[in-house]
């Protein structure tokens, strides 16, 4: 772990989040979020960063991925029960903004066959891109299930106009170790994106959806 957040602090915060949750059982699986507050950063002038990092354990088990596939990929997706759409189904949306928006809302992320990816903007318009869900490419050499898992366990840091951001790093059914490892990966990656690394970090918290925030830094 980087020297700025000690192992003990991290484990203590994780235990607080997980045990706080055990006291109040919710009817849904609470996500654990890493909340970051930045300083010495001017979103207007400084370069807005964005980057993705793959975590060891999938932070959101219910995260849904849809394959926009050629015939072979659609057949594969069907065989393993992964949601999919072929090019004909996409053409039927007829670039209708409402329908494309609905599609973007329905799934958390998309994969598209390499052969189709360049055609997506032409067939669907800019809707998926606007929603921040432009598909990742899927080749025929890749194992589809593994690729979907990779998408599910990848998180994105994106600096917008404000000096705080939040990302899902896990959920409350994880073990302490799984959650600590995910947070460790996420924090170190985030700090590496910042212009002045730790000097740009004002505070770090973790919290479950309904729980109290626990300060890490």
UniProtKB/Swiss-Prot annotation:
Q: Which InterPro entries match?
A: eL8/uL1-like, Ribosomal_uL1, Ribosomal_uL1-like, Ribosomal_uL1/biogenesis, Ribosomal_uL1_3-a/b-sand, Ribosomal_uL1_CS
Major location category of this protein: cytoplasm
Q: Cross-link Glycyl lysine isopeptide (Lys-Gly) (interchain with G-Cter in SUMO2) - where?
A: 118
Keyword Heme set for record: no
Positions carrying N-acetylserine = 2
Source domain of life: Eukaryota
A Pfam family: Ribosomal_L1
Q: Where are the residues linked by the Glycyl lysine isopeptide (Lys-Gly) (interchain with G-Cter in SUMO1) cross-link?
A: 118
Location in or out of the cell: Cytoplasm
Xref: PANTHER family: RIBOSOMAL PROTEIN L7AE FAMILY MEMBER
Record function comment: Component of the large ribosomal subunit. The ribosome is a large ribonucleoprotein complex responsible for the synthesis of proteins in the cell.
Q: Which family does it belong to?
A: Belongs to the universal ribosomal protein uL1 family.
This protein is called: Large ribosomal subunit protein uL1
